[in-house]
Amino acid sequence: MRVITGSCRGKRLVTPDGLDTRPTTDKVKESIFNAIQFDIEGRRVLDLFAGSGQMGIEALSRGAKSAVFVDNSQKSLRCIRENLENTKLQSVSEVVNVDFELYLSRIKDKFDIVFLDPPYNKGLIEKAAAKLYDVTSDFCMLVCETSTTDVPPDEMFGFCVYRRYRYGKVSVSVYKKGQSNE
């Protein structure tokens, strides 16, 4: 796994050992960032269920202003910190060791892009979306990765689907805040 483009292009990223995480493939990641490439520059990013932190790191490499990485796995947090050190992005990053619900209930910041890639088939996208409205900017985008058997609804908690993509058994849904695709 690597950073695809930007200031950290080609840097290798480590991933947590074991079956607890399922890193986004380079192909899927590249497709996601091609779809949102004009919405990254200067934005504040939240990488929820961050795993290796690769989505937030890719956004930073492409010009995002800052990123917060939230995960409650010690293995994941070690990888995120190592990846941030390797890419020299620590100064524009925050790594938070807490459950996503607790984090979302306490923060006052507003995010412009939120990456959601939780464990599949547990309803966590909807649980997170229910708490994200108040901590996101008016032009926020949610980028949700799920299995194709558990695609979130077209509208959820003030976010409307903008685009959907399918890559084998992976589905990516991009939502915009308060905006339908019509």
Roles of regions detected by a PLM:
Residues M1-E182:
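Class I S-adenosyl-L-methionine-dependent methyltransferase catalytic core
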